[in-house]
Amino acid sequence: MSESLGSVPGSLRSGVISPGLSLGADISSFTEYLRAHAPDQLPQARAEAMGLHRAADDIPHGTTIVAVSYPGGVILAGDRRATMGNLIATRDVKKVYITDEYSAAGIAGTAGIAIEMVRLFAVELEHYEKLEGVPLTLDGKVSRLASMVRGNLGAALQGLAAVPLLVGYDIDHDDPTERGRIFSFDVAGDRHEEFGGYQAIGSGSVFAKSSLKKLYRHDLDEASALAIAVEALYDAADDDSATGGPDIVRKIFPLAAVVDAGGAREVDAESIEAAARAIVERRAAEHEGGPR
């Protein structure tokens, strides 16, 4: 499994069943198993542990995630900043996760809940494959994640929303050039497939989508899709204080994953840094001698 599962707490690993608890042959959903036997391990229980009486601004929130599809694959990228109200909580949070062999998810919203949700989702996919002997279809993965988002609705209504952006490579699609697919969700768990080739979520999503609208082409390759994803995050950070741009001094750059016929994998840091530096240098040259 991907490295993202290595950071899942032991109590959430699909291979760990507490003594005396029977899974039940008809339960192929690890989330439903937790709901029945260990509800305190569900992401929405995290909201109760945080205390819903606390102001949402007192809890770290993650922003902004973008996805870009290209013939034969899809790129998912996210900035690194998490905020608490007007404060920067952290500059290097991880918001992009490999969830199984052919999917990846990015998170926006209440960081603690969102991270636990996507980790549990990864375990859910592994658990299903172990029991059924086959992986879930991409549409099945989308339905499972939508159900998990819906389960957090109560906390979302209290200001603790957690919203993912899911990308995947659909090995069952008839057209190989259309197998990279993008799905977004609202806080009530409704799913939306994005057919325009790109999507963004989080506080900087309006600015990121405006950037992608100008940069996107249907004939992109992997490298150019990564470049415009990073540039969209750069543009979002330019106007949204909750989105972190490339930090040249600290060498903190966005994180990204690519999902294609070869599977899901993280984009190496060197490629992302090179893309970010190229954007910064080009923008600096464009503004040279102009207004500051």
Curated annotation (Swiss-Prot):
The keyword Cytoplasm applies. It is found in: Cytoplasm. One of its GO terms (cellular component) is proteasome core complex, beta-subunit complex. Pathway: Protein degradation; proteasomal Pup-dependent pathway. GO terms for biological process: modification-dependent protein catabolic process; proteasomal protein catabolic process. It comes from the Bacteria. Residues 1-62 form a propeptide. The keyword Hydrolase applies. The active site is at T63 (nucleophile). It holds the Pfam family Proteasome. Its EC number is 3.4.25.1. Keywords: Autocatalytic cleavage, Cytoplasm, Hydrolase, Protease, Proteasome, Threonine protease, Zymogen. SUPFAM superfamilies: N-terminal nucleophile aminohydrolases (Ntn hydrolases) (SSF56235). InterPro entries: Ntn_hydrolases_N, Proteasome_sua/b, Proteasome_suB-type, PSB_actinobac. The 20S proteasome core is composed of 14 alpha and 14 beta subunits that assemble into four stacked heptameric rings, resulting in a barrel-shaped structure. The two inner rings, each composed of seven catalytic beta subunits, are sandwiched by two outer rings, each composed of seven alpha subunits. The catalytic chamber with the active sites is on the inside of the barrel. Has a gated structure, the ends of the cylinder being occluded by the N-termini of the alpha-subunits. Is capped by the proteasome-associated ATPase, ARC. Component of the proteasome core, a large protease complex with broad specificity involved in protein degradation. Belongs to the peptidase T1B family. This is Proteasome subunit beta. It comes from Gordonia bronchialis (strain ATCC 25592 / DSM 43247 / BCRC 13721 / JCM 3198 / KCTC 3076 / NBRC 16047 / NCTC 10667) (Rhodococcus bronchialis). The gene is prcB.
